[in-house]
Amino acid sequence: RMRSKRSLRYILFSRCLTRKSPPKYIVKLILAQNNGICNRIVRKHTKILNNGEVCDFIGIVMKGLVQIYHKKGKKRVSDDFATEAYPFFDIDGFVNGKPSGVEIETLEQTVYAKIDKKKLENLCEQYKDLDNLYNRILEHSLISYQDRLNLVLHLDAEEKYSHLEESRIGLTSRISSINVASFIGVTQETLCRIKAKMSDIIY
């Protein structure tokens, strides 16, 4: 029996969203355009999630740039960035319903798709092929978190910056030096020395 086009899109997304698949396949979910998924256009420096709020959605960047960060005193510490086709959400709040300890804000004018947690759960029930969809989305988030830990804990300053440049191509040209430094866990002075050294090597 032939499946509906909408069902096929979800199945395709389910099969593509594996540990080794590139994040661009997450866009397949957006293409389904089911109830509960809506595109939003927001200005630069728009707060999508505030500290203390419960994150009950998953966002996926269509165009633009989003920062996930937490406050340490008066300083903003970057936890992650979401660029085109990347998901963003607070995993602890999304899974456990806890008030968020992070904030989510746009760093550019951004278009993103937002899917409500309950709607996502309903979709998983509606399309039995998607029983593992929820877990796969979380898996992507956990892998990203693990990569962040490895970046901070096991690499020296130069390796951290090089890894960021290689793994997130173009990101460092879109965010400030302050955000780069806080993300890889170095001071701005150290970052300046690294960039100067790399510039000397290139030229």
Residue ranges and their predicted role:
Residues 47, 65-70, 87, 111-112:
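Short beta-strand segments in beta-sandwich/barrel cores
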Residues 43, 62-63, 83, 108:
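A cytosolic small-molecule/anion-sensing beta-strand core signal
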Residues 1-38:
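Cyclic nucleotide-binding regulatory module and flanking cytosolic helices
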Residues 135-168:
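Strongly charged, low-complexity linkers/loops
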Residues 48-53:
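Short phosphate-coordinating micro-motif centered on Lys-Gly-acidic
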Residues 77-135:
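Cyclic-nucleotide recognition modules
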Residues 56-67, 85:
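Glycine- and acidic-residue-biased ligand/ion/polar-headgroup-sensing regions
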Residues 155-203:
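Phosphate-/nucleic-acid-contacting segments
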